[in-house]
């Protein structure tokens, strides 16, 4: 839902005046109902703002994570230490470990 689709603001609802006719609606009931609508509208607007901020934060986080180099799958510190140990044995011979 973009801001362009929203037709009313809480202020628009608050300031809306209805014409009175002889057999019109009870003005107090209309006012009470509009008060509820305004509160809901404000809550929805606040939640929408929070979700937009969270969305922007998560997009930034995704971008940062995508920039980080990835380690090859299955390569752990233990695997690296094993490879290093094997290379040392090969280069220096078994005397180092005896």
Curated annotation (Swiss-Prot):
Entries under InterPro entries matching the protein: Cell_cycle_GpsB, DivIVA_domain, DivIVA_fam
Domain of life (superkingdom): Bacteria
A GO CC term attached to the entry: cytoplasm
Parts forming coiled coils: 34-71
GO biological process terms held by the UniProt record: cell division; regulation of cell shape
Keywords: Cell cycle, Cell division, Cell shape, Coiled coil, Cytoplasm
Subcellular location, record wording: Cytoplasm
Main location: cytoplasm
PANTHER family attached to this UniProt entry: CELL CYCLE PROTEIN GPSB (PTHR35794:SF1), CELL DIVISION PROTEIN DIVIVA (PTHR35794)
Function: Divisome component that associates with the complex late in its assembly, after the Z-ring is formed, and is dependent on DivIC and PBP2B for its recruitment to the divisome. Together with EzrA, is a key component of the system that regulates PBP1 localization during cell cycle progression. Its main role could be the removal of PBP1 from the cell pole after pole maturation is completed. Also contributes to the recruitment of PBP1 to the division complex. Not essential for septum formation.
Family: Belongs to the GpsB family.
Quaternary structure, from the entry: Forms polymers through the coiled coil domains. Interacts with PBP1, MreC and EzrA.
HAMAP family associated with the record: GpsB
The name this protein goes by in its record: Cell cycle protein GpsB
């Amino acid at each position: 839902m973009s801001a362009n689709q929203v037709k009313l603001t809480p202020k628009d609802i608050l300031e809306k005046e209805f014409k009175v006719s002889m057999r019109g609606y009870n003005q107090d009931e209309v006012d009470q109902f509009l008060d509820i609508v305004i509160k809901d509208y404000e809550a929805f607007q606040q939640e929408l703002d929070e979700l937009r901020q969270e969305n922007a934060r998560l997009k930034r986080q995704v971008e940062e994570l995508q920039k980080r180099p990835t380690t090859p799958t299955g390569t752990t510190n233990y695997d690296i230490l094993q490879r290093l140990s094997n290379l040392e044995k090969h280069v220096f011979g078994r005397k180092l470990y005896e």
